[in-house]
Amino acid sequence: MECKNLYRVQEKDLDRLREILTICFKNDPLYSALIEDQETRERLMPHLFSCDVTECFETCEVYADSEELKGILIVSDESDHRHAFYNYFVSLKESLVTDGWLIHEDPSTKTFWNFMLGKDYLNSAWTAQLHQTRRLHVIYLAVDPEY
């Protein structure tokens, strides 16, 4: 997907992308429910978003308002199946890394189980129920609150 009005995020921008997502979702009700302990949430979220950013950069279209990345848009063209196996294995790898971080930061595995129970809210499987062959799924839309 090409867009003349948006900046196409580059690999060099991934740290900033992770930072924006961490800031924007810091007090998100869903993440607060999944990661109940605030200290654990603050330690864990940068790692979780690092996994998401890696996966999204490999499998989705990632745009920003400008090279400063004040606002970001990550979309998945779910009608494009050209790289389905590659995307599956990238997602699988990042899911395993995410699970590792969940257990590392909360050895009680409570947070890990919260994510397992909340997986329906954290994936795009529900879009199959739309019965549309051409879908563009917005994965993340976030704006740095500083701007």
Range-by-range predicted roles:
Residues 5-19, 27:
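A short beta-loop-alpha structural element at the N-terminal edge
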Residues 31-32, 63, 80:
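Short, polar/charged, Gly/Pro-enriched helix-capping and turn/loop motifs at alpha-helix termini
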Residues 74-140:
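Conserved acyl-donor/pantetheine-binding loop and adjacent beta-alpha core of acyl/acetyltransferases
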Residues 38-61, 125-127:
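Active-site rim helix/loop that mediates acceptor-substrate recognition in acyltransferases
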Residues 19-39, 51-55:
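Helix-loop element at the rim of GNAT/NAT acetyltransferase active sites that forms part
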Residues 57-76, 142-146:
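Conserved beta-hairpin
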Residues 13, 56-59, 131-133, 137, ...:
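Hydrophobic, aromatic-enriched alpha-helical segments typical of multi-pass transmembrane helices
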